[in-house]
Amino acid sequence: LQIGAGALRPNAATVPIPFRSARSYFTYDPKRGQIDFSEISVESDWGTARAEGRARLLGMESGWPAALEAQVRIGEIAANPAGLYPGPVVFEGAGADLRLELDPFALTVGDFRLRDRGEVLRLSGVARGQADGWSVDVSGRMETIAPERLLELWPVTIKPKTRTWIDENVLGIALHDIQFGLRGEPGRAPDLFLGFGFSDLSTVYVDHGGAVAA
């Protein structure tokens, strides 16, 4: 199955997510209601990725699935959702357990394991195509991350004053027990939560002064 340029848009109210191309190679076992994917590839301005895995079709009584549950393994990912970054951010790969409901559209991720520079970011959440637009609710956690990588992954348009202060005033820090949350509702600015523990902090404490360690 090969598709040219198009967009994911569950309804007229949702902002379309465009893609340049997509393709998939798969086999289907109707007795088990299972699809085995040897390849799923997507190229778009939001990102590029290649995956493999399997999916189980649910609610086939009408001859068309109401939902599917899937487990996928994803190779290297280059991501830039909604143009949040100056260029694509590259990750080593990922694995995911997910459920896709078609009407109304809802993508639920039970466990998304994103590998990045020897660490693993675990995400879960749901994206819904509502009658008034996209709704997103995502939570994540990570054991540790280098502070410079945190700033690379923190979009400059989200909490820009906090991000700038950290970038300009934190000279060194060891981060652990990172928690992340993103909530988005139609017509409202996204709400970002970031929590973490830290040690070995070194920071500027006045505009023209020295530094303090903690």
What does each of the following model-derived ranges do?
Residues G53-R54, G125:
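Short, T/G/N/S-enriched strand-turn elements that build extracellular solenoid repeat scaffolds
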Residues L121-L123, G210-A214:
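Extended, hydrophobic alpha-helical segments in both membrane/secreted and soluble proteins
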Residues L1-T48, R54-F112, D137-H208:
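Extended amphipathic, helix-rich lipid-handling scaffolds
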Residues D116-E119:
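Internal alpha-helical scaffold/solenoid segments in large eukaryotic proteins
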Residues G125-A127, F180:
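Assembly/interface hotspot detector across virion components, adhesins/toxins, and nucleic-acid enzymes
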